[in-house]
Swiss-Prot record:
Gene it is expressed from: ghrB
Active site: 237, 266, 285 (proton donor)
Entry's EC annotation: 1.1.1.79, 1.1.1.81
Self-association and partners: Homodimer.
Any one GO cellular component localisation term in the record: cytosol
Lineage: Bacteria, Pseudomonadati, Pseudomonadota, Gammaproteobacteria, Enterobacterales
Protein name: Glyoxylate/hydroxypyruvate reductase B
InterPro entries registered for this protein in UniProt: D-isomer_2-hydroxyacid_DH (IPR050223), D-isomer_2_OHA_DH_cat_dom (IPR006139), D-isomer_DH_CS (IPR029753), D-isomer_DH_NAD-bd (IPR006140), Glyo/OHPyrv_Rdtase_B (IPR023756), NAD(P)-bd_dom_sf (IPR036291)
């Protein structure tokens, strides 16, 4: 008999069929307590779990005594209790490589749209304000040859640095847990402490996962150290930034503009002050949101679960020592 798995995110038909070729697949709408209670027998027998955007915590794991692996359709896994999974010897798989280039594209789009005020001036045109040749109140700022500070030089940071260095001749500063020799050799990137990066960068791009150490890493103190002309970009995780401090920095003119793909609470509240600011470009966590990349992520997650339940954890595993 095939192992039983629970799918809590819709898949394209071909990927669902791939999953069904290996497992008995039970589809549920979400992982809410109500759903778990209504499908208690299914959860009790499931050996695998696949989906995204739901919390997987110790309380859920108590209801899934046979669970051996969970696969998320994402690179981030801050919604998983990794300690609880590891304590129960449950593998956690994710999709770290599939979305790199697409998220870097999104970051570069935020850099360009904030600097050149693309969203703001497009709305002014639609509102009928373009009635004569434009003047300085429509102007943006250059991107080329401006200094880009990258906080978090992982795969996505490297892909962004490549675009900025070769495409826009931007000097690159970076801050990370360790020196990145390849970034320094390929892009002439310069490692520096966070304070130096904040003080010298024209654009500050935050690309960090959410951990206990990175929560609210950016607050009033950090924004106060940035140039008043600086543009701040966040496409990592929303809670890495103290959103109230960001709002205050924008309102006080401590920084110039923000381009945001992630927020402390998602979806962003309709009454958030960020939505009424002309100097904010806010998009709904679209970092990896292309048809091609989302399909690739789903395919990777399916293959990850198949591999994990077959004892193959050579790649894409957050806690591979569980398999030892």
């Amino acid at each position: 008999m095939k192992p039983s798995v629970i799918l809590y995110k819709a898949l394209p038909d071909d990927l669902l069929q791939r999953l069904q070729a290996h497992f008995t697949v039970h589809q549920v709408a979400n992982l809410s307590p109500q759903t778990v209670v209504q499908n208690a027998a299914i959860f009790a027998e499931a050996e695998g779990l696949l989906g995204s955007n739901e919390n997987v915590d110790a309380a859920l794991l108590e209801k899934m005594p046979k669970l051996r692996a969970t696969s998320t359709i994402s690179v981030g896994y801050d919604n998983f209790d990794v300690d609880a999974l590891t304590a129960r010897k449950i593998l956690l798989m994710h999709t770290p490589t599939v979305l790199t280039e697409t998220v870097a594209d999104t970051l570069m789009a935020l850099v360009l749209s904030t600097a050149r005020r693309v969203v703001e001036v497009a709305e002014r045109v639609k509102a009928g304000e373009w009635t004569a040749s434009i003047g300085p109140d429509w102007y943006g700022t250059d991107v080329h040859h401006k200094t880009l500070g990258i906080v978090g030089m992982g795969r996505i940071g490297m892909a962004l640095a490549q675009r900025a260095h070769f495409g826009f001749n931007m000097p690159i500063l970076y801050n990370a847990r360790r020196h990145h020799k390849e970034a320094e050799e390929r892009f002439n990137a310069r490692y520096c402490d966070l304070d130096t990066l904040l003080q010298e960068s024209d654009f500050v791009c935050l690309i960090l996962p959410l951990t206990d150490e990175t929560h609210h890493l950016f607050g009033a103190e950090q924004f106060a150290k940035m140039k008043s002309s600086a543009i701040f970009i966040n496409a990592g995780r929303g809670p890495v930034v103290d959103e109230n401090a960001l709002i205050a920095a924008l309102q006080k003119g401590e920084i110039h503009v923000a381009g945001l793909d992630v927020f402390e609470q998602e979806p962003l509240s309709v009454d958030s002050p960020l939505l009424s600011m002309a100097n904010v470009v806010a998009v709904p966590h679209i970092g990896s949101a292309t048809h091609e990349t989302r399909y690739g992520m789903a395919a990777c997650a399916v293959d990850n679960l198949i591999d994990a339940l077959q004892g193959k954890v050579e790649k894409n595993c957050v806690n591979p020592h569980v398999a030892d």
